[in-house]
């Protein structure tokens, strides 16, 4: 498919700073997925990963963020985002042909690594493919990974709890860690248990069926674009709805955090639930 807007050098340099949800967020997504996958999917993943522990997905959830900084993994830097050329907060929207750069993006990466797992689950590329899928589905659910403005907010300086950082970083790391109460693997497990309970019997239980609407293992691009479009809407409705002047002049650890917490927690929950559904579909296909 055509790629009309290759990633500029400046944008790529800033994008290299991104870490998806940060370690805590990615591990939380993975633990949530572990709570919902079928037992056969658990065995499928554990076999590929060579890990039968109770953290088999969480243990690899952040691998892609480390790998992209190696010589071997530098090619994968664009796979963590799609640069929506929209106009927040006035209008938001993601278009695959317009926004997926010539070097690829999160959406094309999901297509590629899903197909590897479908076609060669016992092949030499399956290990990294699974690790990429676990990570990138998490990335897609962070709104600023579906946004071009200032390299997904990396170029927007903000103050959070008295410290200078950038908008992308507080969505990746500061706010989820504050909500969870830390950033260790054990904290991620506890946070995942909280969000999993909301999915099963709590706040999200009436919504969860709609979270997998449109899912189609035969069309990874359309499926992951549904998820990217969903997350991107929050760039207009929550992330930047008050405008840049407010973002630049206000400590965002107060009212901004309060309005954002329900959004990022539900997105993390969606990511884990959808990851489980996607892995179930992969594992159930005849290879």
UniProtKB/Swiss-Prot annotation:
Record-listed a divalent metal cation 3 binding positions: 21, 26, 139
EC class (word): hydrolase
Region Substrate binding, residue ranges: 135-183
Molecular function GO terms recorded: endonuclease activity; metal ion binding; nuclease activity; nucleic acid binding
Annotated binding of substrate, by residue: 21-26, 65-71, 80-83, 93-98
Cystine crosslinks: 92-236, 100-105
Binding residues annotated for a divalent metal cation 2, in chain numbering: 145, 168, 172
Signal peptide range in chain numbering: 1-20
Site (Important for catalytic activity): 65, 68
Record's cofactor remark: Binds 3 divalent metal cations.
Official protein name in the record: Nuclease S1
Gene responsible for this protein: nucS
């Amino acid at each position: 498919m055509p790629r009309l807007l290759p990633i500029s050098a400046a944008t790529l340099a800033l994008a290299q700073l991104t870490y998806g949800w940060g370690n805590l967020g990615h591990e939380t997504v993975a633990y949530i997925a572990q709570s919902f996958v079928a037992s056969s999917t658990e065995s499928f993943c554990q076999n590929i990963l060579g890990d039968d522990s109770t953290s088999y997905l969480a243990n690899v959830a952040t691998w892609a963020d480390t790998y992209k900084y190696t010589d071997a993994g530098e090619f994968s830097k664009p796979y963590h985002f799609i640069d929506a050329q929209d106009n927040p907060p006035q209008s938001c929207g993601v278009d695959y042909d317009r926004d997926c750069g010539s070097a690829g993006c999160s959406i094309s990466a999901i297509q590629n690594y899903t197909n590897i797992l479908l076609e060669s689950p016992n092949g030499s590329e399956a290990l990294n493919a699974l690790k990429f899928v676990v990570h990138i589905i998490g990335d897609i659910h962070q709104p600023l990974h579906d946004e071009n403005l200032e390299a997904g907010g990396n170029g927007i300086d903000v103050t959070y709890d008295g410290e200078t950082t950038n908008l992308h970083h507080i969505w990746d790391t500061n706010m989820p860690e504050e909500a969870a109460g830390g950033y260790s693997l054990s904290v991620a497990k506890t946070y995942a248990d909280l969000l999993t309970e909301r999915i099963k019997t709590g706040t999200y239980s009436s919504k969860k069926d709609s979270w997998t609407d449109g899912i189609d293992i035969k069309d990874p691009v359309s499926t992951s674009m549904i998820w990217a479009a969903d997350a991107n809407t929050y760039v207009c409705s929550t992330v930047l709805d008050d405008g840049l002047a407010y973002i630049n002049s206000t400590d965002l650890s107060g009212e901004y955090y309060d309005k954002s917490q329900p959004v990022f927690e539900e997105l993390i929950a969606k990511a884990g639930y959808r990851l489980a559904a996607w892995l179930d579909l992969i594992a159930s296909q005849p290879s």
